[in-house]
């Protein structure tokens, strides 16, 4: 909460939200007198993501980040997606919502961004195969055959 408060103050944020409501008292104390509003919990995350802003950075770990990402998409905004789980768990639904609401999804997760950069300026029809390497995750110990 202290790090979030410091960033909120540094970047003149209007609102700082923690997902874990147990951290809210610490966040409020760290933001006291700053003018930054503190909020906590799942509903606060979704409400924050639905606000009209220039860009939403979605970096909540795991599937917990899906509801805020969908709220930002439904607003029709630009979302810098640093959470690959939203795509893994609900990619088809998410991409349909992006198209329906005119949202823009920018990949900021390292692997997704690497593909995005490689494809930039190329026609997708000209790409036959993409090989994605990874530095970790649950498949890191699997053989290539598996």
Could you tell me what each predicted segment is?
Residues 24-33, 42-46, 59-75, 83-104:
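Rossmann-fold NAD(P)-binding glycine/threonine-rich loop
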Residues 1-63:
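N-terminal glycine-/serine-/threonine-rich beta1-alpha1-beta2 phosphate-ribose binding loop
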Residues 104, 112-146:
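Conserved anion/nucleotide-ligand pocket segment
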Residues 21, 85, 111:
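Residue-level "edge-of-site" marker
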Residues 12-13, 33-34, 51-55, 74-77, ...:
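Short coil/turn connectors at secondary-structure junctions
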Residues 49-51, 67-70, 91-92, 118, ...:
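Short, conserved acidic/polar surface loops in the N-terminal third of protein domains
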Residues 18, 37-41, 57-58, 80-82, ...:
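General beta-strand structural signal in soluble alpha/beta enzymes
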Residues 41-44, 109-117:
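Short, glycine/charge-rich beta-strand/loop segments that flank catalytic centers
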